[in-house]
Swiss-Prot record:
Recruited to PIP5K-induced vesicle surfaces in the absence of functional WASL. Residues 21-31 have a biased composition (Polar residues). XRSGPXPPXP motif repeats lie at residues 352-361, 374-383, 410-419. GO terms for cellular component: actin cytoskeleton; actin filament; cytoplasmic vesicle; cytosol; ruffle. The keyword Phosphoprotein applies. It comes from Homo sapiens. InterPro entries: PH-like_dom_sf (IPR011993), WAS/WASL-interacting_domain (IPR053099), WH2_dom (IPR003124). It comes from the Eukaryota. This is WAS/WASL-interacting protein family member 1. The gene is WIPF1. Residues 32-49 form the WH2 domain.
Amino acid sequence: MPVPPPPAPPPPPTFALANTEKPTLNKTEQAGRNALLSDISKGKKLKKTVTNDRSAPILDKPKGAGAGGGGGGFGGGGGFGGGGGGGGGGSFGGGGPPGLGGLFQAGMPKLRSTANRDNDSGGSRPPLLPPGGRSTSAKPFSPPSGPGRFPVPSPGHRSGPPEPQRNRMPPPRPDVGSKPDSIPPPVPSTPRPIQSSPHNRGSPPVPGGPRQPSPGPTPPPFPGNRGTALGGGSIRQSPLSSSSPFSNRPPLPPTPSRALDDKPPPPPPPVGNRPSIHREAVPPPPPQNNKPPVPSTPRPSASSQAPPPPPPPSRPGPPPLPPSSSGNDETPRLPQRNLSLSSSTPPLPSPGRSGPLPPPPSERPPPPVRDPPGRSGPLPPPPPVSRNGSTSRALPATPQLPSRSGVDSPRSGPRPPLPPDRPSAGAPPPPPPSTSIRNGFQDSPCEDEWESRFYFHPISDLPPPEPYVQTTKSYPSKLARNESRSGSNRRERGAPPLPPIPR
């Protein structure tokens, strides 16, 4: 141990010397070493960084420069929406930029909506475009309707319904939320996918039918709203208002007024026809609660319109979705569930349409059972959702109506049978029963079984603890470590302090 200390001392003197020498020797070199720093401080060598913000240019290009391209691209979107969409998109070239915005909105709904508004309609109407962007589905929707209507709806959006669409802007945001379910069409197609996906899955011809009818009859825009792009429903409402010539217009005014009264609700009423409403108007549903009659009114108006009368019955199911909003507390949850279940929900509706509607009713009783084993919390609401989807898709949803009943309770007016169904279903109560049932199945049966298996021993049965004796405890391992480390380290470390003394 004594040997190591001597070598240690020499390094300290060297370090000390180095420290003392550095200032003197490096004074000349300091300039060279610090040249970069000094230059930076002076700002001579600094170059301004050039940033390429492609986000804004991209938005601008599709909107303005890419208008033609936008039309073409949107034509593709239209094709997705319907066969005639391609032609419609091409004819819509002028509005193409907003369409592009709508397509892009999946990524950045807010920015695109604002940009679309500014570029297309100017200060006041930008909101229309954003909804339009989302409801660019309107463009796809209008493609089915036809290029002529296309331009008309777009002007309508810009001119008449900007406020309603603005009001609906919030619903489009829900659409954004719903977009995850159907992102590619996110804005327009989101509602469509929701509706179309349910309808397309269950009966794609149905959506196609409404869309095709929409091109043919003047009401089609409104039917289109239901069938083609309820997501674009807000847009279509505006288009409907814009296309006031259509008989739909009178019903539309109520929707705009609703939009004015409750911005979110108006989109739901048109969208209310489809489950997409929940996605689009997840927030709106609560307003719908405020205006359940309004949603029902849209339904009557929708039903009143000739082309979709059969769809309206099927859509009554979706009205239940708005009714889902009927549960103020549950409204967001149901919409959310619809969103989460949207993909799943459409399949159920499709089966419902296909004709296993009875199974959905049968499922209803099982749902509580399934729910207890399955997802205790969410499933019960999802069953309603699935029921809503299936019911919405299938007219014979009378059994489903019970599920609706809870959902539609606010809107029971339109369908008297619903009230009895509601009492039977007791929509809000059923979830609690389901929860209780879950608790019963999961908890009560389990608890009974476990309780029967196990019981607490009385303290008398337990053996007394050993008496506690205080004793000093030595841990040799700890001592050895401390001694070896402390002794050796102290000795080794002790040497270095000596070098300072030679200084």
